[in-house]
């Protein structure tokens, strides 16, 4: 058992759900010779020190079998879980992680997650004196994103904590036509999270709230509970994840170009 003077351990959980409306079996889609979930794990592993534990949390034995062939740590979780956060909490409980340990949630469909971003975010969280939860924000760079509900916006307060998240444009510029709204006033949310285990348990043990259900944003549950969410700001948007067949083709091309450049 760790003594109170020892630093908290850092763990990364990569949720990987087999079912997907647009891309069934998405974690196992081949990306330049490897399953996507393997690509994500390799990117995370390359970004972080060996002292950081990394495990994939899935709901399907096919994903388990694929990862075991690559000797990648994997845990089966309840297929009825509604979110990756729930999978993170189950893994943390089953593996007996301490209440002050840091759990980082990296999405399983982000094979191009920038390693410097991930490394800097984890260091930011590890250096924090005290926090329940943290996430990432980047500048919003396209006017079309203001009204795109798939691009989540957020407002950050003076202490570096999230005030609110929304699929709508926040803030709303009352005195300007929309084509004159300054993009510099907006931040875009990136779905990478970190939690203290104690906060993760509290969050997943609390039923969803109306704000969360209306926006379909689970982080609104933390806002509703009054849990502070620290925001790590990164200077540029990361590459988009994989949600469609077009995304698959784009990522394959990027990986091919990157591999050609190294050869």
UniProtKB/Swiss-Prot annotation:
Pathway: Nucleotide-sugar biosynthesis; CMP-3-deoxy-D-manno-octulosonate biosynthesis; CMP-3-deoxy-D-manno-octulosonate from 3-deoxy-D-manno-octulosonate and CTP: step 1/1; Bacterial outer membrane biogenesis; lipopolysaccharide biosynthesis. One of its GO terms (molecular function) is 3-deoxy-manno-octulosonate cytidylyltransferase activity. One of its GO terms (cellular component) is cytosol. Its EC number is 2.7.7.38. It catalyses: 3-deoxy-alpha-D-manno-oct-2-ulosonate + CTP = CMP-3-deoxy-beta-D-manno-octulosonate + diphosphate. It is an enzyme of class 2 (transferase). It is found in: Cytoplasm. GO terms for biological process: CMP-keto-3-deoxy-D-manno-octulosonic acid biosynthetic process; lipopolysaccharide biosynthetic process. CDD domains: CMP-KDO-Synthetase (cd02517). Activates KDO (a required 8-carbon sugar) for incorporation into bacterial lipopolysaccharide in Gram-negative bacteria. This is 3-deoxy-manno-octulosonate cytidylyltransferase 2. The lineage of its organism: Bacteria, Pseudomonadati, Pseudomonadota, Betaproteobacteria, Burkholderiales. The gene is kdsB2.
């Amino acid at each position: 058992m760790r003594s109170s003077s020892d630093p908290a351990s850092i763990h990364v959980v990569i949720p990987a759900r087999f079912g997907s409306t647009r891309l069934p079996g998405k974690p196992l889609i081949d990306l330049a010779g490897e399953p996507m979930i393997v690509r994500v794990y390799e990117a995370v592993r390359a970004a972080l020190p060996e002292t950081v534990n990394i495990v994939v949390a899935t709901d399907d034995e096919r994903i388990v079998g694929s990862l075991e062939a690559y000797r990648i740590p994997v845990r089966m979780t309840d297929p009825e879980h509604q979110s990756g956060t729930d999978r993170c909490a189950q893994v943390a409980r089953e593996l007996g992680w301490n209440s002050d340990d840091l759990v980082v949630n990296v999405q399983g469909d982000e094979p191009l997650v920038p390693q410097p971003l991930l490394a800097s975010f984890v260091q930011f969280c590890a250096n924090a004196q005290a926090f329940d939860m943290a996430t990432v924000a980047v500048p919003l760079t396209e006017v079309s994103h203001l009204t795109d509900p798939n691009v989540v916006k957020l407002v950050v307060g003076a202490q570096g904590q999230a005030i609110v998240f929304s699929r709508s444009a926040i803030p709303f510029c009352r005195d300007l036509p929309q084509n004159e709204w300054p993009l510099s006033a907006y931040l875009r949310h990136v779905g990478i999270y970190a939690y203290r285990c104690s906060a993760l348990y509290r969050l997943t043990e609390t039923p969803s709230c109306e704000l969360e259900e209306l926006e379909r944003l689970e982080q609104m549950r933390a806002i509703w509970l009054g849990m502070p969410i620290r925001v790590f700001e990164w200077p540029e948007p990361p590459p988009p994840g994989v949600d469609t067949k077009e995304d698959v083709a784009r990522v394959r091309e990027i990986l091919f170009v990157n591999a050609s450049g190294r050869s």
